[in-house]
Amino acid sequence: MLYPTPIAKLIDSFSKLPGIGTKTATRLAFYTIGMSDEDVNEFAKNLLAAKRELTYCSVCGNLTDDDPCLICTDKTRDQSVILVVEDSKDVSAMEKIQEYNGLYHVLHGLISPMNGISPDDINLKSLITRLMDGQVTEVIVATNATADGEATSMYISRVLKPAGIKVTRLARGLAVGSDIEYADEVTLLRAIENRTEL
């Protein structure tokens, strides 16, 4: 169906979001058009504010509005353990279970030889830098149970083991190919409790 240009552009913008197909993008576009000017302005203001005000923590790489983030500056957290995740959504998923009390490190991607993504293309160098002070004794790799997640975890283990750092992996309560952000709290809790050494 042919839509007026402003609606077609809005549909195109919504369809660029992950998991949003043309049908959902069309529904969102028409819903947005039906919103009051006040609500549309509020939505646009919040979207722009999030884009402008959020940054990545210079220590762990997590999305934050403070640098360093609240997790990195919280001295009550266990400073000897770092849980490594693919992205900030995974930090949120782990924090929901309210059982893990260590620090995080966000990679912003995974090693993917098939897609030409090497260790230099993700946030690994800063992880190694964080480990140099000797305070961290364990790194828990919490990447998704995919080929790229496995490649990343094996690389991290290979790099860190010679330094005497214990490297563990979440237990397999997570189905192969599943994303951490979609796992329920009990599954994540069991995965942390039953982690295995790499």
Curated annotation (Swiss-Prot):
Which BP terms from GO are recorded? DNA recombination; DNA repair
Q: Which CDD domains match?
A: TOPRIM_recR (cd01025)
Source organism's superkingdom?
Bacteria
Q: Name one Pfam family in it.
A: RecR_C
User: What one GO molecular function would you report for this record?
Assistant: zinc ion binding
Q: Where are the zinc fingers (C4-type)?
A: 57-72
* Gene3D superfamilies in the cross-refs: 3.30.60.80, 3.40.1360.10, 6.10.250.240, RecR Domain 1
Which UniProt keywords are given for this protein, alphabetically ordered? DNA damage, DNA recombination, DNA repair, Metal-binding, Zinc, Zinc-finger
Task: List all membrane-crossing ranges.
Answer: none
- Cite the Toprim domain residue spans from the record: 80-175
Q: What NCBIfam families does the annotation carry?
A: recR
Q: Read off the HAMAP family from this record.
A: RecR (MF_00017)
- Similarity comment: Belongs to the RecR family.
Function, as annotated, reads: May play a role in DNA repair. It seems to be involved in an RecBC-independent recombinational process of DNA repair. It may act with RecF and RecO.
Under what name is this protein listed?
A: Recombination protein RecR
The species this protein belongs to is Streptococcus agalactiae serotype V (strain ATCC BAA-611 / 2603 V/R)
* Protein's gene: recR
